[in-house]
């Protein structure tokens, strides 16, 4: 790779990092072609961008980014692939699902909404984080619940008073 190509790659990575608040870094080395293809397909279906990157280029892109990645660049050794998503738990769920069949991909670290998570031991926590949409749905459900109880009570009261009037 020439210096110019590296510079362009760093600019592209910096732009990708600037466009998201959710990045997972994992090691997918050792996966055969079929498994890697299945992983890419699953990522595509979930709206996740999966890209194998050079560690030095990713480290420089993180440096150039306006985000504070903390200790995340320290995990950049060996083979690295980044998962870029709009949903915080989607890459974690995919990695966890693939780990049922083999020991890879291994989570190196993640950056989610200004929080840095380092190590494969964080995978369970990251996979169970509720997405923004799930949280909004829960809040709406909680807000609707008291109103539904009141309406139900009023309907029962009204139905009871109609029965008494008919007798």
From Swiss-Prot:
Assigned GO CC terms: ribonucleoprotein complex; ribosome
Disulfide bonds: none
Pfam families reported for this sequence: Ribosomal_L10 (PF00466)
UniProt GO MF annotations: large ribosomal subunit rRNA binding
Assembly and oligomerization: Part of the ribosomal stalk of the 50S ribosomal subunit. The N-terminus interacts with L11 and the large rRNA to form the base of the stalk. The C-terminus forms an elongated spine to which L12 dimers bind in a sequential fashion forming a multimeric L10(L12)X complex.
Stated role: Forms part of the ribosomal stalk, playing a central role in the interaction of the ribosome with GTP-bound translation factors.
Protein name: Large ribosomal subunit protein uL10
């Amino acid at each position: 790779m020439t210096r110019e190509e590296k510079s362009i790659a760093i600019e592209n990575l910096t732009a990708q990092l600037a466009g998201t608040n959710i990045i997972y870094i994992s090691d997918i080395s050792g996966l055969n072609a079929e498994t890697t293809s299945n992983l890419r397909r699953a990522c595509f279906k979930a709206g996740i961008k999966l890209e194998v990157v050079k560690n030095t280029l990713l480290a420089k892109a993180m440096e150039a980014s306006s985000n504070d990645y903390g200790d995340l660049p320290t995990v950049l050794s060996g083979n690295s692939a980044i998962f870029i998503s709009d949903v915080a738990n989607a890459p974690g769920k995919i990695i966890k699902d693939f780990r049922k069949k083999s020991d890879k991909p291994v989570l190196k670290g993640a950056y989610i909404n200004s929080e840095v998570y380092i190590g494969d031991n964080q995978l369970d926590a990251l996979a169970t984080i509720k997405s923004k949409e799930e949280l909004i749905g829960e809040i709406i459900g909680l807000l609707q619940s008291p109103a539904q109880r009141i309406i139900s009570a009023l309907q029962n009261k009204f139905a009871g008073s109609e029965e008494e009037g008919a007798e």
